[in-house]
Amino acid sequence: MQSYNIAVLAGDGIGPEVMAEAIKVLNRVQEKFGFKLNFNEFFVGGAAIEHCGYPLPAETLKGCDQADAILFGSVGGPKWTNLPPDQQPERGALLPLRKHFKLFCNLRPATLYKGLEKFCPLRADIAAKGFDMVVVRELTGGIYFGQPKGREGDGVQTKAFDTEVYYKYEIERIARAAFEAAMKRNKKVTSVDKANVLQSSILWRETVTEMAKDYPEVTLEHIYIDNATMQLIKSPESFDVLLCSNIFGDIISDEAAMITGSMGMLPSASLNEEGFGLYEPAGGSAPDIAGKGIANPIAQILSAAMMLRYSFNLNEAADAIESAVQKVLASGHRTADLADDSTPVSTAEMGTLITQAI
């Protein structure tokens, strides 16, 4: 029987509550599909500060090193905002984990589920078509990290500058990740750039076009970033996999998230070249609702499904979780963030309903 070790970092706020439901669902699929998941829990973020004095203790990092994947909850809260920036839960835990494991590829799915169209801010006729896309964002290159960057001069002559730098190998590996993701989905990649203006985008487009030759089953199209932001509003159903540089992906992934209508539904994954991944909900720790049993666990549960798909290649089990989520939503069950006139189900009840639907 295939066995996998998972470092479970529930973190702060609603993290422990929603993580418990993800574990519940994972226990169901490992029983149904005949593989073994070993869960090892570690402190991270504010919880780690309280117990160990550091947001990312050495024991936690060691546990992650020994794992096959990291299932991450959420970190942060008002209790720790007065700490020095590098000691705060977000910057002191999540960023070092990304750096340590060389997580260069961010996957952000955005899906509008049947029955949730009214939460979509788009026109009703557009929302009625639904959409199911994933944004593939390069995480370690581009203008956020390029050199030189800085400020110089004074008075009206003060200037600030940043540099957009991409190496061909950086574009190749993120393009490969996008094409591989498309192979598991609807076999279409839309590469986002600004090749009519930027040299970095010209290299981006050339390289992605070359890479496409290795994936003849996948349809490739190129789109300028300004047009991409418009088409996301006009016809989101036309997208499958959106391939983006760091800064363009930062913008596009948030736009795609907002048109779904609920951050509580959105998972994410950050991967390295070996397929090792950190999987987490796209939303935050929501300390205002922590402990009330009303948080939506679906983003955490879908993050677990992504882990099965992208790190372990357990596509059938991942499909089963995603189908169960769709079934439960289609039957009208809602947590408080999505409930209207109906009585909302609790965090634990939603987890149980999804588990039973598998």
Swiss-Prot record:
List the GO terms this entry assigns under cellular component, sorted alphabetically: cytosol
Under the subunit heading, UniProt states:
Homodimer.
Please state which protein family the record places this protein in.
Answer: Belongs to the isocitrate and isopropylmalate dehydrogenases family. LeuB type 1 subfamily.
By what name is this protein known? 3-isopropylmalate dehydrogenase
| UniProt cofactor(s) | Mg(2+); Mn(2+)
**How, per the record, is the cofactor bound?**
Binds 1 Mg(2+) or Mn(2+) ion per subunit.
Q: Which PROSITE patterns match?
A: IDH_IMDH (PS00470)
State the superkingdom: Bacteria
Q: Does the keyword Transport apply?
A: no
- BP-aspect Gene Ontology terms: L-leucine biosynthetic process
* Pathway(s) per entry: Amino-acid biosynthesis; L-leucine biosynthesis; L-leucine from 3-methyl-2-oxobutanoate: step 3/4
* Residues holding NAD(+): 77-90, 284-296
What are the alphabetically sorted keywords of the record? Amino-acid biosynthesis, Branched-chain amino acid biosynthesis, Cytoplasm, Leucine biosynthesis, Magnesium, Manganese, Metal-binding, NAD, Oxidoreductase
Annotated substrate binding sites: 98, 108, 137, 226
Q: Which organism is it from?
A: Haemophilus influenzae (strain ATCC 51907 / DSM 11121 / KW20 / Rd)
Q: Which InterPro entries does the UniProt record give?
A: IsoCit/isopropylmalate_DH_CS (IPR019818), IsoPropMal-DH-like_dom (IPR024084), Isopropylmalate_DH (IPR004429)
- According to its UniProt record, what is one Pfam family this protein matches? Iso_dh
* Catalytic reactions on record: (2R,3S)-3-isopropylmalate + NAD(+) = 4-methyl-2-oxopentanoate + CO2 + NADH
| UniProt: Mg(2+) binding residues | 226, 250, 254
Q: Where in the cell is it found?
A: Cytoplasm
State the Gene Ontology terms under molecular function.
3-isopropylmalate dehydrogenase activity; magnesium ion binding; NAD binding
